């Protein structure tokens, strides 16, 4: 029976088929390109170039023929359009960069290409990664494959929708305040945001430099581990990249997946694992359907040998105001470079130089980006810097300290990714505050720089996916992936696909 993308359940399955010559990288690429074309209504991709993709696939086949293949050689992947890519336009979902072509590849793209992965195209996203629904893109909103009248989550919504719909077996994403975890939850896939600095930011178009972090999005923890092997590691071109002395050593995350815990048994592989449940994550605001799915998943973890422990993260409610001071402040600085002079959109008609700046930025940026630039400029202005920005940084430190206290009582923290399942397209666009509140459970992890992931754990209202959030201590990606993998070995939520 010939290999087909219809039967794909994991990247390992693809890698094994390629190694066994059951399918060639070129044949696989052609099949996924056909799926992308058939799934255009989702609007998950903003750039596809079959010639470039097939050239990479042929190179992967040649590499395998020469005996130089890695576990990822020939495996297709889609890249979020926030990573610059030579040969494809790199737009960050914005009119400002609608025609920008980068002369180089982002380190993440470069490393995965070096492993032999084949780029299928660039995925849609909220403009400059600012959004929770993928409705802020210059190229239009993305639809959720489980219900096309709903959002896929954001800002990595195109990547999430592409993986969920089978248009790509894996994708890259970025997470500033939840932009890998929330769309993974809404779209029923697995995604991990590594410790800040684990994955290079070089070539990632910046939103908030002290928060942005790249990571993989795929169907399973095993897939994410395989991808993280290729993505993680120190990069001298990124000043925020972790050096080996600070934890930037590349681990073999796939090998660690199956490493038995001390005292574990076949029926209880997680014996001795302490799971912290923050009381602030299970109170007012969490919808009943989401909580029901989470409680069932936690009961499964108990069957696997884990112990549930109550912990507290008292400053959780402050994470929204803190984030929406720090992130816009950094965005206003990062986006000041887009002035219509060096690169980016330039207004066709203008008077003097100042008028050109104003018109180019007014035309090039969308409403949400303008809103955040204005907020950021305000909190950094004279008379408000001390009152807002510095105070927010102090509370950020307290939020990080809260996590460290919690980790003295537990090994992994679990809770919801979002208060609800995916909402309807257009439902929250008129009320930015309601949109911001959807990130209440993911922001604090980002502010602390901790690793976090979303794992499918059931379904809620409208038969929409629900994700369980796993949060680890610094550099604890291996334990997070191992914990998620054990759950996925015992359940099949990650194998469910939209009709």
From Swiss-Prot:
Gene3D superfamilies assigned to the protein according to its UniProt record, in alphabetical order: Amidase signature (AS) domain
Active-site annotation: 80, 155, 179
EC identifiers of the protein: 6.3.5.7
Domain of life of the source: Bacteria
GO biological process, one term: translation
GO CC list: glutamyl-tRNA(Gln) amidotransferase complex
Subunit structure: Heterotrimer of A, B and C subunits.
Protein name: Glutamyl-tRNA(Gln) amidotransferase subunit A
């Amino acid at each position: 029976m010939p290999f087909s993308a219809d039967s794909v359940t994991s990247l390992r399955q693809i890698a094994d088929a390629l190694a066994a010559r059951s399918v060639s990288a070129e044949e696989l690429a052609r099949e996924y390109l056909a799926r992308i074309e058939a799934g255009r209504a989702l609007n998950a991709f903003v750039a596809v170039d079959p010639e470039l993709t097939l050239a990479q696939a042929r190179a992967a086949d040649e590499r395998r023929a020469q005996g130089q293949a890695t576990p990822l050689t020939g495996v297709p992947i889609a890249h979020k359009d926030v990573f610059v890519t030579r040969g494809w336009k790199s737009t960050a979902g914005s009119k400002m960069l609608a025609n920008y072509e980068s002369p180089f590849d982002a380190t993440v793209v470069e490393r995965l290409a070096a492993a032999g992965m084949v780029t299928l195209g660039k995925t849609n996203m909220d403009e400059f990664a600012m959004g929770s629904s993928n409705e802020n893109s210059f190229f239009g909103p993305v639809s959720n494959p489980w219900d096309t009248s709903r959002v896929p989550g954001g800002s990595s919504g195109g990547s999430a929708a592409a993986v969920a719909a089978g248009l790509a077996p894996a994708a890259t994403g970025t997470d500033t305040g939840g932009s890998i975890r929330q769309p993974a939850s809404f779209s029923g896939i697995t995604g991990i945001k590594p410790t800040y600095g684990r994955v290079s930011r070089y070539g990632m178009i910046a939103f908030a430099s002290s928060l942005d972090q790249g990571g993989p999005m795929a169907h399973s923890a095993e897939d994410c581990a395989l991808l993280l092997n290729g993505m993680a590691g120190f990069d001298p071109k990124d000043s925020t990249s972790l050096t080996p002395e600070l934890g930037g050593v590349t681990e073999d995350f796939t090998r660690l997946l199956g490493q038995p815990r001390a005292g574990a048994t076949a029926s209880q592989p997680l014996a001795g694992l302490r799971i912290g449940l923050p009381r602030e994550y299970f109170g007012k605001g969490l919808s009943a359907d989401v909580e029901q799915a989470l409680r069932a998943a936690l009961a499964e973890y108990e069957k696997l040998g884990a112990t549930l422990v109550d912990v507290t993260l008292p400053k959780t409610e402050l994470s929204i105001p803190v984030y929406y001071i720090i992130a816009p402040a950094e965005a206003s600085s990062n986006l000041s470079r887009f002035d219509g002079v060096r690169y980016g959109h330039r207004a066709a008609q203008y008077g003097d130089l100042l008028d050109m700046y104003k018109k180019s930025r007014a035309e090039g940026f969308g409403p949400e980006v303008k809103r955040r630039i204005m907020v950021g400029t305000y909190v950094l202005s004279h008379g408000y810097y001390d009152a807002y920005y510095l105070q927010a940084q102090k509370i950020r430190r307290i939020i990080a300290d809260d996590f460290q206290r919690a980790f003295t009582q537990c090994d992994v923290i679990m809770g919801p990714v979002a208060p609800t399942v995916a909402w309807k397209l257009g439902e929250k666009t008129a009320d930015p505050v309601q949109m911001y509140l959807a990130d209440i459970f993911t922001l604090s992890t980002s502010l602390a720089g901790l690793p976090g992931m979303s794992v499918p754990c059931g379904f809620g209202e409208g038969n929409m996916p629900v994700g369980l959030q796993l949060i680890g201590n610094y550099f604890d990606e291996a334990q997070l992936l191992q914990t998620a993998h054990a759950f996925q070995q015992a359940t099949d939520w990650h194998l469910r696909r939209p009709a």
